[in-house]
Amino acid sequence: MTELDKDTFDQAVLAHKGVYLVDFWSETCETCAAMMPEIETLERELAGEHALAGKVAFGKVNLQGNRRLAIREKVMSLPTVVVYRDGEKVKAFSKEFTASEVKAAVEGLLGG
């Protein structure tokens, strides 16, 4: 999963053609720490599914030092996972959600 910050986000995510999943998190967020392995597993699962391999990119933004970016992207609670398609936000998951819900949304966008 690519580490993103205020200097790399626009080029990596907003200029990306296709689906990009971004995990907004913080070191002080216990729920974020619990969810991170599930999102990393989801990344491996989607990379391993032949039909979806290479069709979705993954990144994460630590809010430490990136609060303005989070505010700009309307991330108001943690953890938050945002799904972008062709640089546009299409779906956001906040606080209580499962990796399965995120996977279903990504597969829906990819027709998988």
Task: Please place each PLM-identified region on the residue numbering.
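A short glycine-leucine-enriched loop at secondary-structure breakpoints
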Residues: 72-76
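Short pre-active-site segment immediately N-terminal to redox-active cysteine/selenocysteine motifs
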Residues: 17, 25-28, 77
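Structural microenvironment flanking redox-active thiols in thiol-disulfide oxidoreductases
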Residues: 61-70
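The canonical Cys-X-X-Cys-His
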Residues: 29-32, 81
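Non-catalytic, surface beta->alpha helical segment in thiol-disulfide oxidoreductase systems
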Residues: 77, 82-112
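A short beta-strand-turn-helix
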Residues: 2-19
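Typically the conserved alpha-helix immediately C-terminal to a functionally engaged Cys/Sec
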Residues: 31-48
